[in-house]
Amino acid sequence: MEKVKIYGDAVKNMPWKEKPEGFDGVVWRHDNNPIIDWNPTKKSARIFNSAVLPYEDGFIGVFRADHKNGRPQLHLGRSTDALNWDIEDEEIHWVDEQGNDYQPSYAYDPRLVKIEDTYYIVWCCDFGGAALGLGMTKDFKTFVRLENPFIPFNRNGVLFPRKVNDKFLLLSRPSDSGHTPFGDIFLSESPDLVHWGRHRRVMTKGGQGWWQGTKIGSGATPIETSEGWLMFYHGVSGTCNGFVYSMGAAILDKENPSKVLYRTRDYLLTPEKEYETTGFVPNVAFPCATLQDPETGRIAIYYGAADTYVAVAYAQVDELVKYIKENSELVDGDDVEYK
């Protein structure tokens, strides 16, 4: 297989650890996980399921912080090495497009992406039920809420890092108020981030992999590569001891991302370490963000662990893409090409 190219800017100072000797997987954990532990700020008991990006000479992050009253909000954080984070005590203050206060009653599971010169945040908020919130910032000082993309109920909203065929693209998972039925990933497009349509089912739960038999959800912002869009996602299995959240990956067609080219039959990472199996919600590995360096092919994956911690794992793009292609299983509906 030819060397896989990652498109984007170099990130030379991103975290990295070489694969442990004798390890036969393609995703391996950071030695000093978790990188964010219990009670990280005055207000919050737990931080997890959070998003990071390169910014200026370091890194910026939008973090899900579950406050000590149990209600989640989004907090801003900064770091010089993307491992040690200075997280603000107060939650992000939002305004509407006219500059009026527009604070969500709760906010969780953010995704963060830069498109051209603007940073966009997608999260889950209360909009007559759990729905996707959408906001923007140019400077991480003023945060403006835009129109909510969809009606309830919807979660796991992830914007692509550039327009495709001159349209913004958004992955999401429609559901009901219990957030478990349905369980498939959909793609929607918009010319202006206000009007959304051409909804397409991208990936379905199930198949031979029981680890993703209950539901799946898009994770980190898709990474543009020469092989297609590399997307990390979570898959959920139901057990007699509750849900188990594991990590998988798929490659979507570059020009028609509603079409799945390959997806992992087996999980890439599942809860095994104590910080993944024990916490506020046990047995969760929930990918939300990546850092990647085109020059080296290195990928750092940020994931929430046990709804309590932030953890990091690593992969090398050539090895990872090769593995996905050689260990792929499509589920009914994955390879449908909509007209």
Region locations from a protein language model:
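Beta-rich carbohydrate-recognition and catalytic domains
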Residues: 1-105, 113-158, 162-214, 223-280, ...
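C-terminal substrate/ligand-recognition segments
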Residues: 288, 292
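Catalytic core of Fe(II)/2-oxoglutarate
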Residues: 220
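Aromatic sugar-binding surface patches on proteins
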Residues: 284
